[in-house]
C-alpha cells in the first residue's frame, strides 16, 4: 500500500518543527559573563550573580554538585571568573533563572594564587555586585570589565587598578564627573557629581589635593595609571571617598565589607 503526502502536510510539519526548535532555544540560552558573587541558599543550591554580555546583571539558582567530578565544577564559582554558561528562564512566580553547564572560558593564571590580586578580586566582586545590580545589557561596560580582569591577571604594577576600575564603571553608569572640566584648585562635590571652584558647604566633598589626584587618575588608562603618584594614605582615602561617592549615587549601595581588607593591603 502506498501513501501520498500532500504539500500541505510537509508545510505544516516543517512549521511545527521550526516552532519546536524555537521554543527549545528559548528554554536554554548560551551566554558569556563575569561571575560577581555567590551566596549559599541551602545545602543543595547557591544563588549566583553574573554580569552577562547580553542580559546585564542576572541572578541564577545553581545546583551544587556532590561528587568528586562536580567539586571541580563548583570551584569555578570564584570572584571575577569569566564564564560561559547555559541558563533557563525563571519559573512562574520567580525572577531567578536556572544556571547550567557553566565553564571557565578564560582561566586565570595568577589571580587565584596571588594573595594581593585575590584580595583585589574579592573587593571588586563585592563592589560590582552592588554597583551593577540594576544594570541591564551594557556591552561597552561588559567589555571594559572583561578587559580589565584579563589585564589584572597578567599585570605586575597594579596598585591603582581597583581605583581606576571604580572610576571607569562610574563613567559607564553616567555618575562619574568629567575630569576634563577639572581646573587647578577645584574640589570634587560628591553630591553634585562635579568639580567646583569653591569648597561646598556640606561635608560630602574631596579636598583640593585629592581632587587633583582623582582627576589625574581619571584621565589615564590601564597602561598609564601608575604614572599618577599616590601615597599609600592617599590611595586608602580615595578608596573610601569613591565608596562614599557610590553610596550617594547608587540606591542601596552599602558600606562594603571587604574594604577593610583592601585598605590593609595598600597601607
Question: Model-derived features: where do they sit?
Answer:
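Non-catalytic alpha-helical scaffolds and adjoining flexible linkers that form interface surfaces
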Residues: 21-46, 51-267
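Short hydrophobic targeting helices and cationic amphipathic motifs
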Residues: 4-5, 9-10, 14-17
Amino acid at each position: 500500500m502506498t501513501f501520498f503526502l500532500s504539500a500541505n502536510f510537509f508545510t505544516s510539519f516543517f512549521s511545527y518543527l521550526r516552532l519546536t526548535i524555537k521554543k527549545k532555544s528559548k528554554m536554554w540560552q548560551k551566554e558569556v559573563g563575569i561571575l560577581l558573587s555567590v551566596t549559599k541558599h541551602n545545602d543543595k543550591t547557591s544563588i549566583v550573580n553574573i554580569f552577562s554580555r547580553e542580559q546585564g546583571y542576572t541572578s541564577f539558582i545553581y545546583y551544587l554538585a556532590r561528587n568528586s567530578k562536580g567539586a571541580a565544577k563548583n570551584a569555578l564559582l570564584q570572584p571575577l571568573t569569566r564564564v560561559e554558561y547555559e541558563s533557563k528562564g525563571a519559573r512562574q512566580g520567580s525572577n531567578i533563572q536556572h544556571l547550567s553547564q557553566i565553564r571557565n572560558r578564560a582561566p586565570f593564571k595568577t589571580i587565584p594564587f596571588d594573595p594581593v590580586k585575590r584580595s583585589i578580586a574579592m573587593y571588586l566582586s563585592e563592589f560590582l555586585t552592588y554597583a551593577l545590580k540594576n544594570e541591564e545589557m551594557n556591552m561597552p561596560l561588559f567589555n571594559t570589565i572583561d578587559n580589565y580582569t584579563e589585564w589584572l591577571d597578567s599585570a605586575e604594577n597594579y596598585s591603582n587598578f581597583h581605583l581606576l576600575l571604580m572610576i571607569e564603571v562610574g563613567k559607564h553608569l553616567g555618575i562619574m564627573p568629567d575630569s576634563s572640566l577639572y581646573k587647578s584648585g577645584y574640589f570634587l562635590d560628591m553630591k553634585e557629581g562635579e568639580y567646583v571652584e569653591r569648597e561646598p558647604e556640606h561635608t560630602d566633598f574631596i579636598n583640593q589635593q585629592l581632587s587633583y589626584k582623582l582627576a589625574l587618575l581619571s584621565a589615564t588608562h590601564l597602561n598609564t595609571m601608575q604614572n599618577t603618584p599616590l601615597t599609600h594614605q592617599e590611595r586608602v582615602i580615595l578608596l573610601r571617598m569613591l565608596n562614599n561617592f557610590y553610596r550617594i549615587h547608587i540606591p542601596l549601595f552599602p558600606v562594603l565589607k571587604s574594604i577593610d581588607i583592601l585598605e590593609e593591603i595598600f597601607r
